[in-house]
Design a protein with these regions (language model features):
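Ordered, small/hydrophobic-rich secondary-structure cores
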Residues: 29-123
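Context-gated lysine
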Residues: 17, 97, 111, 158, ...
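Intrinsic-disorder/low-complexity coil detector
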Residues: 49-51, 65, 71-73, 165, ...
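Intrinsically disordered, low-complexity segments enriched in Gly and acidic/Ser/Thr residues
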Residues: 192-283
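Surface-exposed beta-strand edges and their flanking turn/coil or helix-capping segments
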Residues: 59, 128-133, 235-237
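Extracytoplasmic low-complexity, Pro/Thr/Ser/Ala/Gly-rich segments
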Residues: 1-62, 152-212, 222, 290-293, ...
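General structural signal for secondary-structure boundaries
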Residues: 1-6, 76, 102, 131
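A short, solvent-exposed beta-edge/loop patch
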Residues: 79-152, 243-318
Length: 318
C-alpha cells in the first residue's frame, strides 16, 4: 500500500473474524482500511470460500466487482484476478477508483481465498498505464501474504508490470474475428448481432462478452463466473430469483422468459462454473420475438471456450 498512498500520515483500521476451514464452509473475513488524507483510500478484504450456507440470504457473500458499464479485465501474469472500474475514462467521476481482486485456489481441499482491494486516489488516473499496475500489485502482494498466513498452497503469479484498461461501452469491434472472451460466439442476422466488446482470456474468475448491433447498441450479455463468484451468483438466485427453477438447483436451464444458464464442473473441488446469457432488452418479462435458438447457441459457444480455458469439464447446456 505504501506504493499507492505513501509512508506518512496514514490512518489504519482492521478486523479479523471467523476461521479458514471447516466442513460446512469457511467464515474467514478480514478487513483493513488505510486512509491518507488528501491522497486517497485503500480498502482490503480477504474472504475464505466457500461460505457457510447460513450466510446465504444475508446479502452478497463477497465484495462486488463493478461490471455494469465497463468490462473487468484480467490481471494476467499467472494470477487469477481482475481489475474493474465503474468508468475508465480520464476525468470522469469514476476515474481514480478501481477494484482489483485475486483468487487463490488452495491446494487439494476445495477451499479458496478471495482478496479484493478497493482503491480511491484523488490525483491518479486509470488512463495512465503506470497507475494500473500499482492498483493491482496491492492485491497480489496481499494475496502472497494471505497464501502464507493461511497455508493455502495456491499457485501464485508473477510480478505485475502492465494491465489493460477496463473496456468502455463504445469500445466495440466486429464479432467476426473476436479472439478474447467473445471468441467462437456466432453472429445473428435476426437478432442483429454483429459487434462485440470483449477482454483477453487469462484465467480470470469472471469473464464477460457483450454483444451488440452494427452501431454497438447492446443486444446480449454473456457472463462466466468461477469459484466464489459462481457461489455468490447461485446464492443470489436462491434468494431473489422469483423463478420456478434457478442456477442454484440445476446445472442448466432457462430463467423464465429472459435468460439461459449453463454449468461446468471444475477441478479440485471448486464450485461448479456458471454461465449466463441475457438479452439486454429483457428484465424477466416476456419478449415479443425472442431468438431462443441464437441465445442457446451463443451461450453454448461462450461456455465451451471459457470452460476449456479454465480446465473445467464440458459444460451442461440447456
Amino acid at each position: 500500500m505504501r506504493a499507492v498512498l505513501g509512508d506518512s500520515g496514514v490512518d489504519v483500521t482492521s478486523s479479523t473474524k471467523g476461521a479458514f476451514g471447516g466442513d460446512r464452509g469457511t467464515s474467514l473475513d478480514v478487513r483493513c482500511q488505510v486512509t491518507a488524507e488528501g491522497r486517497g483510500r485503500v480498502g482490503v478484504t480477504i474472504s475464505g470460500a466457500p461460505r457457510p450456507r447460513a450466510e446465504y440470504g444475508t446479502g452478497e457473500l463477497y465484495t462486488a466487482v463493478p461490471a455494469r458499464d465497463t468490462l473487468p479485465v484480467p490481471v494476467g501474469h499467472g494470477w487469477s484476478g481482475l481489475l474493474a472500474t465503474d468508468n475508465a475514462r480520464q476525468g470522469d467521476p469514476g476515474d481514480g477508483k478501481a477494484t482489483a481482486s485475486v483468487l487463490l485456489d488452495c491446494a487439494g481441499n476445495g477451499r479458496s481465498l478471495l482478496i479484493t482491494v478497493e482503491t480511491t486516489l484523488g490525483a491518479a488516473t486509470l488512463d495512465d498505464p503506470a497507475t494500473r499496475p500499482s492498483f493491482v500489485r496491492t492485491a497480489t502482494a496481499t494475496a502472497q501474504r494471505a497464501d502464507d498466513r493461511w497455508d493455502c498452497g495456491a499457485r501464485l503469479g508473477k510480478q505485475v508490470y502492465d494491465v489493460d484498461l477496463p473496456v468502455n461501452k463504445d469500445e466495440y469491434e466486429p464479432l467476426i474475428g473476436a479472439d478474447g472472451t467473445c471468441a467462437t460466439v456466432p453472429t445473428a442476422a435476426r437478432s442483429a448481432v454483429s459487434t462485440a466488446r470483449e477482454t483477453a482470456r487469462a484465467r480470470a474468475p469472471r469473464e464477460v462478452c457483450a454483444l451488440g448491433a452494427r452501431d454497438g447498441s447492446s443486444r446480449y450479455r454473456l457472463d462466466a463466473y468461477y469459484g466464489p463468484y459462481a457461489e455468490d451468483a447461485r446464492a443470489q438466485y436462491t434468494r431473489n430469483d422469483g423463478e420456478d427453477v434457478t442456477p442454484a438447483e440445476k446445472p442448466a436451464g432457462r430463467l423464465g422468459q429472459s435468460a439461459y444458464w449453463a454449468g461446468a464442473d471444475c477441478p479440485d473441488g471448486a464450485p461448479r462454473a456458471l454461465y449466463l446469457v441475457r438479452a439486454d432488452d429483457a428484465d424477466g418479462d416476456a419478449r415479443a420475438r425472442p431468438d431462443l435458438g441464437y441465445e442457446r447457441a451463443a451461450l453454448s459457444a461462450f461456455a465451451a471456450r471459457s470452460a476449456e480455458d479454465h480446465g473445467c469439464a464440458e459444460p451442461v447446456t440447456p
